[in-house]
Amino acid sequence: MNPLKKLASQTAVYGLSSVVGRLLNYLLVPLYTRYFLPAEYGVVTELYAYVAFLVVLLTYGMETAFFRFSKKEESTKVYSTTLISLLISSVVFVGLIFLNSSAISEWLGYSNHPEYIQFFALIIGMDAVSSISFAKLREQDKAMRFAFIRVLNIIVNVGFNLYFIVYQEYGIAYIFIANLFASVITLIMLFPEMLSSSWVFDKKLWKKMMIYALPLLIAGLAGMTNETIDRILLKHLLPNTDIAASELGLYGAFYKLSIIMILFIQTFRFAAEPFFFAQEKEGNGRKIYADVMKYFTIIMVIIFLGVTIFYDAIKGFLGSEYHDDRGFLVVSILLLANLFLGIYYNLSIWYKLTEKTKYGAYLSIFGAIITLSLNFTLIPLLGFVGCAWATLICYFSMTVASYYIGKRHFSVPYQVKRIALYLFVTLCIYFCIYFTNLNMWINSLFLLGFVIFVYRLEKPKLSLKL
């Protein structure tokens, strides 16, 4: 089967689960923004930002290590060793958090709600254990089972949210309880994979995996700094503390409006990581990586234009308390930032294939330094608009750095000029939209024109590939 077709088919299956799941999850945004004030939603936004850090910490790069070592060692032994490692670390983590939940909740400013911390400890622990079984499904190309469990998780989460918030009219604590129920059911659904494990812990293999994975952990933590630190710092750095929680809630809601691009990136990564490793030994592997990058970028810029053109319709998903004039600019900046993040993920294959994962850590730390310095500088001046600019500058800088460093270690013939052309045309269209007050449907002609433009340039290659 044509490698690009295989990647496309796998992405479609993973994408179906992510699209259906995320769209169902997306329904929670209008729910939350209609039942909770921005200050209340700010609590949800902040706590989930911390969760993102802790999930990375608790999986410590073992998913990617599992993919790498499954190609070199006996897959059953690799899975068993990884599963036992994650089980032990997760149990220890949950126990420590429960013992210190009161102190942690007081430190975060939620001293009356230590149960929030306990709920999240259980969620994070179960999700960390589940992650390796999901990785096993991906490694075995069991995309349908992967998709089914992912969608079930979201359906359960959304269902309990609707029951607790709409029917029972409970408070925000029940958002976390709904998530906890979903995590429990997901773990139960993955029991067949876990029970099929040989339950053998290979200490020598584990050490090798940890050496490979630890730089990825550092990269992951630095990456989470880039993705979520703005929502952690925002309420602490705003000069007007009276509106800090409300501003955080607004920013969290606007961040959700960029979900379509984040969704595609996540979907692509589920399929692409095992695909890239599988193509490593192929003679034309590097050419395939270059083609994937180009077509990935095309899809990303189309998503960018689609969301910005139809923003007025999309913002209707938010409650009236969340309609703010800063929304369009912030969402546009975040979309562009995520576009560069997606390109960076494509580029990052060079240090994974060459086992120079320390460079992933270096690049992420480089990005984290930019993110932290810009957030501390821009938030007091621009509020959450400064958060968005910091994210864009960070991801753009990481992309450029990864490209030039990667050229020296693992040269891939990326079509840089063609990709740059598409980005330039996209930005020209965006500025036409931003600085004019044309009707949304008239603006959509720009999108149609861009698609035709791309098709005319790529048609010979598409015909050849397909």
Region spans (language model):
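Hydrophobic transmembrane helix module of multi-pass membrane transport proteins
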Residues: I84-T228
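Membrane-proximal transmembrane or re-entrant/amphipathic helices at the cytosolic face
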Residues: V412, F431-L466
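Transmembrane helical elements of multi-pass membrane transporters/channels
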Residues: Q10-N25, N153, I175-T186, L190, ...
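Signature of the first transmembrane helix
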Residues: N2-E63, L87-N100, I123, I154-V158, ...
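Alpha-helical transmembrane segments of polytopic membrane transporters and translocases
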Residues: E40-L58, R231, E247-I265, K294-I298, ...
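N-terminal membrane topogenesis motif
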Residues: M1-Y26, F67, K77-S80, I84, ...
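Interhelical loop/hinge segments that connect adjacent transmembrane helices in multipass membrane
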Residues: M1-P3, L7, I172-A173, I188-E227, ...
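Specific pore-lining/lateral-gate transmembrane helices of multi-pass inner-membrane transport
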Residues: F69-S85, L250-S364
